[in-house]
Amino acid sequence: MTNGSELCQQSDIACRTAGLVSHREKGTEPMGKKAGTKSTGPKKASRSTGPDVTGRPSDAPQGDAAAATPKMKTKEYEKQMRLLHAELVAMQEWVKATGAKVCIVFEGRDTAGKGGTIKRITERVSPRVFRVVALSAPTDREKSQMYVQRYVPHFPAAGEVIIFDRSWYNRAGVEPVMGFTPPDQVTRFLELVPAFEKAMVDSGMILIKYWLEVGPDEQTRRLESRINDPRKIWKLSDMDLKSYSRWYDYSRARDDMFRATDTSWAPWFVAHTDDKKRGRLNIISHLLGQVPYEPLPQRDVKLPKRKDDPDYVDPELPLRHIPEKF
């Protein structure tokens, strides 16, 4: 597979990286601002797809400078994430109130951080609005169906945000690379997907597609971490080990996918995630810029007075309390 700059050298797609702009003033200091400058609140990307560039964003560090860029500090990361979480809640309330339908697709290299990003998107919102779909291998019955058929029942209804942790694009990535699907079926799939996604968008759905890109050295480090850390070993599969050796096969499959399925109605957005913290913030900020939400007026909520009941007495029940070890 390729590094960040090779990504666009091999592919006809122009990597889209929307510049981050403030959503509205909140009296807080945005990421990267120097002390004493005007605060503009959380960073939210413009709804525009942004300028077409080759490689990484024009304002991103290049070459050795990129490698030398220090990882974001946890304190600053959590500060910015709190602001973005508040915006995600505002987006959620707008989706519920307007009946909007939002479908988000996450694809990318193994270890690129899809699961971690999705976790940070969903950890402060309602699971009744935000729902994650991660389908397992198809059953024999599903294999006999139209390929995209098993994904359709999971599409969002009014007032829902559905996040696909991998999607119908398995047919364009892992399946051809691992030899699960013959080339003619992959070609046919790539020919049909634009029309399929056009129908999704024409039905009123907001479709957002992300590709998470991680460099080869960072991927190696993350896989070794999974091998050596008993808390992460469950993340490591035989498929990860097989695909690790096929970096450039995945690169070619990715490039073919971009060429065939990057459309004006369903474009691909590329996120560089060697720095997980920066990557997550950039993705969430960009996501907020793709949904035309407006914050709803907040209710003035006050707790009611709790009623007294002087007649109530705690019963003498044989309650089993858990040990208080901490």
Where are these regions (language model features)?
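Glycine-rich phosphate-binding loop of ATP-dependent small-molecule kinases
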Residues: 9-326
